[in-house]
């Protein structure tokens, strides 16, 4: 096993010994780079061949259950030599690293191995709720303690810093950042944006599937009630949306992959799709 790991590491170094070309966001990195990516995110779907609910590793021939496999995306930016991978389970996680100094993705490892890409994720939600409850009780208790003891500011700040460190150390157990801190600033890449944001996304990416409710081949817009009903194959595509502070992005996933970045405060319509469907797309292909 040790020899195998050394070979994988050596192969990874060889891959990174020359300037790597740009790798767009993709679920399937080049075959020659599989040892590199599969060393650091070994549960990603592109590392495995699955048959009859049993998956065999393409690199090590190791076998695991299909329930432990998750969908992943990998990206590499050549100028900055930064590598990025996203683990898309019930609650997506993102990880950036230097391509020449990669790090295994340990923060979500337990979650992947135990819950995989399917199954019931209520235990994770319950764990988060319990943590928030304990954190709230601890915070209130801390305020009461400081008030009763009449502590000086210096001591108060030390205790607050200690509490913050404890919260930070608890993150690996929660498998994701505290959503209460990131909810407004960062929207993970997801197929279904929050309901409160549907009007925003469906205004500029109106052909995305999350904007429509379809039944018996007919689709009704979720946001604009006066929008005419359309047929289910009338240019509705799977979409992914993301938001980082003031930068928003949506991707359309179908025969031709498209990614569009925009300023969140100055969004642009998905105009390319109108021309594309007019000249290229056949409804039977969607």
Swiss-Prot record:
Pfam families per the UniProt record, alphabetical: v110
Name the keywords, alphabetized: Glycoprotein, Host membrane, Membrane, Transmembrane, Transmembrane helix
Keyword Transmembrane annotated: yes
Q: How does it sit in the membrane?
A: Multi-pass membrane protein
Tell me which InterPro entries the record gives. ASFV_fam_110
Primary subcellular site in the record, as a coarse category = host cell
Q: Where in the cell is it found?
A: Host membrane
Membrane-spanning residues: 1-17, 128-148, 153-173
- Identify the glycosylated residues: 61, 238, 263
Report the GO terms under cellular component: host cell membrane; membrane
**Membership in a protein family:** Belongs to the asfivirus MGF 110 family.
Which function does this protein serve? Plays a role in virus cell tropism, and may be required for efficient virus replication in macrophages.
Stated name of the protein: Protein MGF 360-3L
Q: Which organism is it from?
A: African swine fever virus (isolate Tick/Malawi/Lil 20-1/1983) (ASFV)
What's the source species' lineage? Answer: Viruses, Varidnaviria, Bamfordvirae, Nucleocytoviricota, Pokkesviricetes
């Amino acid at each position: 096993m040790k020899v195998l790991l050394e070979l994988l590491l050596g192969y990874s170094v060889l891959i990174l010994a020359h300037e790597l070309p740009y790798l767009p966001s993709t679920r399937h990195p080049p075959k020659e780079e599989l040892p590199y990516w599969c060393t650091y995110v070994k549960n990603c779907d592109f590392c495995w061949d699955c048959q009859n609910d049993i998956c065999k590793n393409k690199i090590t021939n190791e076998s695991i259950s299909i329930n432990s496999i998750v969908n992943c995306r990998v990206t590499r930016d050549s100028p900055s030599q930064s590598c990025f991978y996203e683990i898309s389970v019930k609650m997506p996680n993102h990880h950036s690293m230097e391509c020449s100094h990669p790090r295994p993705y340990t923060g979500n490892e337990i979650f992947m191995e135990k819950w995989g890409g399917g199954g019931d994720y209520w235990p994770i939600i319950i764990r988060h709720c319990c943590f928030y409850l304990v954190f709230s009780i601890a915070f209130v208790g801390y305020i009461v303690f400081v008030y009763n003891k009449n502590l000086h500011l210096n001591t108060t700040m030390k205790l607050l810093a200690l509490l913050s460190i404890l919260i930070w150390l608890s993150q690996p157990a929660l498998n994701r950042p505290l959503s209460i801190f990131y909810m407004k600033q960062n929207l993970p890449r997801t197929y279904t944006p929050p309901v409160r944001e549907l009007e925003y996304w469906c205004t500029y990416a109106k052909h995305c599937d999350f904007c429509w409710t379809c039944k018996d081949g007919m689709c009704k817009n979720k946001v604009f009630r006066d929008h005419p009903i359309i047929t289910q194959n009338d240019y509705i595509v799977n979409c992914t949306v993301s938001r980082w502070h003031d930068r928003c992005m949506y991707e359309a996933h179908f025969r031709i992959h498209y990614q569009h970045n925009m300023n969140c405060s100055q969004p642009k319509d998905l105009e390319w799709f109108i021309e594309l469907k007019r000249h290229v797309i056949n409804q039977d292909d969607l």
